[in-house]
Swiss-Prot record:
Heterodimer of an alpha and a beta subunit. One of its GO terms (biological process) is fatty acid beta-oxidation using acyl-CoA dehydrogenase. It comes from Caenorhabditis elegans. The keyword Secreted does not apply. The electron transfer flavoprotein serves as a specific electron acceptor for several dehydrogenases, including five acyl-CoA dehydrogenases, glutaryl-CoA and sarcosine dehydrogenase. It transfers the electrons to the main mitochondrial respiratory chain via ETF-ubiquinone oxidoreductase (ETF dehydrogenase). This is Probable electron transfer flavoprotein subunit alpha, mitochondrial. GO terms for cellular component: mitochondrial matrix; mitochondrion. FAD binds at residues 275-303. SMART domains: ETF (SM00893). Pfam families: ETF, ETF_alpha. It is found in: Mitochondrion matrix. The keyword Transport applies.
């Protein structure tokens, strides 16, 4: 492990006097239900030893706020409901966080380490003139953390002296918070939300009857070794037998075999299922960063020197075009 370093802050004007230790978690959701990574972030936030509040922003935030209030460990839920906050663009959410910080003087502001969290937390950190710490995998104390570096190939213990800690938590490193709470729900402080900084153009959502990659207990992923998109049927057939989610390596996505929402890796989705089956995937650093925390890893590859075998619990050196159909046929 690399040696610890100190994260310094230039924000000397932020007063620490008479502050109660308190943490704000910025919720991620789709206007109807809370994103699972927020539950992981709440668990991580509770390890700071502070009172935990959750900020829910959006055009229809009330329903999600009610869900959050029932989460164990949540003391307060702040709700900012405004049409300007539809789709929760980071440029529009940040002013609400800053207004909440001004009123409640939190000692830590956190979120899950997702595209949303990575968009909003550094923005708020810049406004507060402090350094943010990303991809935290372990909380040692209120000011000491372990985070990943170099696509997950190194870990580093860091200590922050900043008066406000700005953190994103890797979801797969923390258990999701359970229900059982009764947090108070109240309106968030009003904020000046500017709409000319960014614009939401639209999104295309893929529909699938298979489990979502982020929550699936079993994931079957295919790589460049499948040679074509049509051959991904081998992956789909096996996944359907196992009730699994389907993923892919970046190489398979870049080759056009499958859409990029299936990508597992540093620039894709981070997963940690009970079982991860990698088929025709060599095991590039970028891919390993997204799945190496899986409980059991099975690799099928004809190259005995493929890096994927270094992290696999079970490795099968075989031609995937023979091995996978045989495996699928053998399953009930």
């Amino acid at each position: 492990m690399l040696s610890a370093r100190t994260v310094l802050s230039r924000a000397g004007l932020i007063s620490n006097a008479s502050r109660l230790n308190s943490t704000l978690v910025v919720a991620e959701h789709d206007e109807t239900k809370l994103a699972p990574i927020t539950l992981n972030a709440i668990t991580a936030a509770s390890k700071l030893g502070n009172e935990v509040s959750v900020l829910v922003t959006g055009a229809n935030a009330t329903k999600v706020a009610e869900q959050v209030a029932k989460v164990n460990g949540v003391k307060r839920v702040l709700v900012a409901q405004d049409e300007k906050l539809k789709n929760n663009l980071p440029e529009r959410v940040a002013p609400v966080i800053l207004a909440s910080q001004k009123q409640f003087n939190f000692t830590a502001i956190t979120a899950g380490s997702s595209a949303f969290g990575r968009g909003v937390i550094p923005r708020v950190a810049a406004k507060l003139d402090v350094s943010s710490i990303s991809d935290v995998t372990e909380v040692h104390s209120a000011d000491s953390f372990t985070r990943t570096l170099y696509a997950g190939n190194a870990v580093k213990k860091v200590k922050s002296t900043a008066p406000i800690k700005l953190l994103t938590f890797r979801g797969t490193s923390f258990e999701p918070a359970k229900e059982g709470g009764s947090g108070a729900v109240e309106n968030a402080p009003s904020a000046d939300i500017k709409t000319d900084l960014s614009e939401f153009l639209g999104q295309e959502l893929s529909k699938s009857e298979r489990p979502d990659l982020a929550t699936a207990k079993v994931v079957v992923s295919g790589g460049r070794g499948l040679k074509s998109g049509d051959n991904f049927k081998l992956i789909y057939d096996l996944a359907d037998k196992l009730g699994a989610g389907v993923g892919a390596s970046r190489a398979a996505v870049d080759a056009g075999y499958v859409p990029n929402d299936m990508q597992v890796g540093q620039t894709g989705k981070i997963v940690a299922p009970e079982l991860y089956i990698a088929i025709g995937i060599s095991g590039a650093i970028q891919h390993l960063a997204g799945m190496k925390d899986s409980k059991v890893i099975v690799a099928i590859n004809k190259d005995p020197d493929a890096p994927i075998f270094q992290v696999a619990d079970i490795g099968l050196k075989a031609d995937l075009f023979k091995a996978v159909p045989e495996l699928t046929a053998a399953l009930p």
